[in-house]
Amino acid sequence: MRTALLFILLLLTACNQGPTLERLGGPTMGSSYSIQYVREPGGPEPAQVQRAVETILHDIDHHYSTYRGDSIVSQFNRLPAGQCLALPPDMLALVSLGQHLAEQSDGAFDLTVEPLLDLWGFGPQARHQQVPEPQALAQVRQRVGYQHLRVKGRALCKDAPVQLDFNSIVAGHAVDLIAARLQAMGISSFVAEATGELKAVGRKPDGSPWRIALELPREDRQIARQIIPVDSLSVSTSGDYRHYFEQNGRRYSHTFVARLGRPVEHDLAAVTVLDASALLADGYSTLLLILGPQQGWDFAVAHDLAAVLVTRAEGGFVSRATPAFERAVKGQ
């Protein structure tokens, strides 16, 4: 009788347990990832979720890391001109998006920027950060250009010794994959974040929306400039304020105008883009940052992108939000 009564009490206690907020995270892509999710009674445990997430991130690293000699992208980058390499479908899809963004930006955005990153001191083969000599820059620019890539069946081919760098879009791709996996596991409310790119779906256990802080573009500390409610949207911010060097009083960031072979030279400090796809948000935030304050604004408005552009001004920053961003924040 006591055993039966104890079983009934335990069962009633389990039935009364509501949803809980679980958190987990770890290192990835030279940075970190974090997951918050609402665990319903009987839902997947954090350890199970973490294994699923890290399986995805391991595959991402094997496909896209330029810091691994055995990655697929490193294998492609070592190929001489005139050669092809069979790629997994997801890599071909990202190449296709990169080519589309390159065409939209007249070559300002370009996945073949890797040799420039190395030359200026931001890539995996970099020796030191400095402005390169004109002759060295001219030689490297011959190895940059999206027009040197072509897809042949399931293979990617090159007609010049170009090298790929997916860092402008791969974190968003990872977030989309993680979000899809969480939903397949029956998790309907979560925030999935990798290297700062994130996607929020559903609501917290108390029914309130997920709220995301958009930072001021400062390298010394983190200060929120705006906090927005997010549901079923991805948030991507690209900026030039954390990875840069200075030489002779000038600032050189890791964001490049590929067709010019140089870092950006304008006052646009950061761009945030909202989109249902973390991949697209990631790509377009980078593209707008490359284009600069006015050309980026014109592009965002013309393509109905939900974007905020933060420009350096005397004494601080000026933020400018597109109509699509205002609608997205209001849930329209």
List where the protein language model places each region:
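Bacterial N-terminal signal peptides
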Residues: 4-13
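Mature catalytic core of soluble alpha/beta enzymes
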Residues: 14-332
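N-terminal hydrophobic targeting signals that begin at the initiator methionine
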Residues: 1-2, 16
